[in-house]
Design a protein with these regions (language model features):
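Bacterial N-terminal signal peptides
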Residues: 8-18
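Extended ligand-binding regions for polar small-molecule ligands
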Residues: 24-27, 69-75, 153-158, 169-171, ...
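Extracytoplasmic small-molecule ligand-binding "clamshell" domains
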Residues: 25-120
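Bilobed "Venus flytrap"/periplasmic-binding protein-like clamshell domains
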Residues: 46, 62-75, 146-191, 197, ...
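Periplasmic-binding protein-like
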Residues: 48, 144-150, 221, 229-269, ...
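Short beta-strand-to-loop elements that line the ligand-binding cleft
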Residues: 80-90, 174, 192-201
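Acidic, polar ligand-binding/catalytic clefts
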Residues: 82-164
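A ligand-binding cleft/hinge motif common to bilobed small-molecule-binding domains
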Residues: 93, 117-132, 183-187, 210-211, ...
Length: 299
């Protein structure tokens, strides 16, 4: 009996050692703050084709997050290298590919800092079936914006939009597999579902509204405000409608680093706090014709 117990104990200890060695190997290639400063380059991950936050025009990077990354790099006295993120099915995939492990095709590419990630205690503290933190190798910090859902409508088709109940009678465009899609399909006991039209992106839904295919679009406020700024159609209006039973209609956007690189997180958070306090963050959003709402801790 005793040898069997010892063998089992050895197996457990061996497994724990393997996990520890694996975890250490994941941190080995993560640049420290000092290494990043010495290299003279800050690698920042931003989402690809995500106007107004990070996108390209004629090969030139633009957007709120791009300019925020430029400002951070400038304040740190280093050059900026952007890493463009093609979003995975879940943000956990993006953390794995750009923060703690690297993409399976390019494990040598890893970001020092990632922008536009959820800043939410419940999300950060999620645990798997074994009770382990889902993203134990990631630190989410530094909220710099509050985002929310918004509906834009064609006022020639809908006189006023005070409740989403109006979509019992008017078609509304949403991005497929999005929160607005799930919400509108189930709201009012499913009575809106026949008028919910799906598109590959909010941009495609917005174009369909301009063409008269749908009478409204529900998507992220920043995205819709940007699209509104790119059109001269005065008939398109923002709705102040509430979204009953939506759940999280407002959320905060922050940043992420590898858990071993908290020194960078402290430095970057100090910089963004200063930008929020002195109005530079507001000015950055104004430049892209966006409403800017401070995170709760700064209000």
């Amino acid at each position: 009996m005793m040898p069997r117990i010892l063998l089992s104990l050895c197996a457990v200890l061996s497994g724990l050692l393997t996990i520890q060695v694996y975890a250490q190997s994941l941190s080995t290639d993560v640049r420290s703050f000092d290494d990043m400063i010495d290299a003279g380059t800050l690698k920042v991950a931003v989402y690809e084709n995500f106007a107004p936050y990070s996108f390209t025009v004629d090969g030139q990077a633009k957007g709120v997050d791009v300019e925020l990354a430029e400002q951070i790099a400038q304040e740190l006295g280093v050059n900026l290298e952007l890493l463009w993120v093609v979003p995975g099915e879940k943000i956990d995939d993006d953390f794995r590919n750009f923060i703690w492990r690297g993409h399976y095709l390019r494990k040598d590419i890893r970001a020092d800092l990632m922008l536009r990630v959820p800043y939410d205690r419940e999300f950060s503290n999620r645990r798997n079936e074994l009770g382990e933190l889902v993203n134990e190798l990631v630190v989410m910090f530094g909220p710099y914006q509050r985002e929310r859902w918004l509906t834009v409508y064609n006022s020639r088709r809908i006189k006023s939009l005070e409740t989403v109940g109006v979509f019992q009678y008017h078609p509304v465009g949403v991005e497929e597999d999005s929160v607005p899609s799930f919400y509108l399909l189930t709201a009012f006991a499913g009575r809106l579902s026949s008028n919910v039209k799906h598109f590959v992106s909010p941009t495609a839904a917005f174009a369909a509204m301009q063409d008269g295919e749908v009478d409204a679009v529900m998507a992220m406020r920043g995205v819709l405000e940007w699209l509104l700024s790119q059109t001269n159609n005065a008939q398109l209006k923002k709705s102040e409608a509430a979204y009953p039973n939506l759940g999280q209609a407002i959320w905060e956007v922050g940043m992420a680093v590898h858990e071993s690189n908290r020194q960078l997180a402290y430095a970057v958070e100090a910089l963004t706090e200063a930008m929020i306090a002195d109005g530079r963050m507001q000015a950055l959003y104004d430049k892209y014709h966006l409403s800017y709402e401070k995170p709760e801790m700064y209000q």
